[in-house]
Amino acid sequence: MLTETALDQVVGSPEVLRGQLEHLLGLGARDDVTVQVVPRSVPNNPVLGEGLITLDFGAAAPRIAFKGSHAPATYYDHEEGTTPMFRAMDRLRELASSPEESVVLLSEKLRGVQ
């Protein structure tokens, strides 16, 4: 899951951005990866300005979450910390474009890279 705004950020060069978009499209074509884009028009992004990683291992291990930005990441491994993080990720998933819509958006962005 990534924001549309992130897709517009040229870091390095347009060639780097083109490679990143191609890589995301390749990942989205895999059966074991889901790529979703949160459109810039979506209000109230629950993780705006920070990263969020959630890991759910089922019965094998407790759920964990990482939250971070430019400072050291915060690691959550207890239910009282992970529950809000998983709720935020669920909400983000609801707000994001479908995987199919995201492929269309990524393709449009790729065509627009100068």
Predicted stretch roles:
Residues 1-114:
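Hydrophobic protein-protein interaction segments
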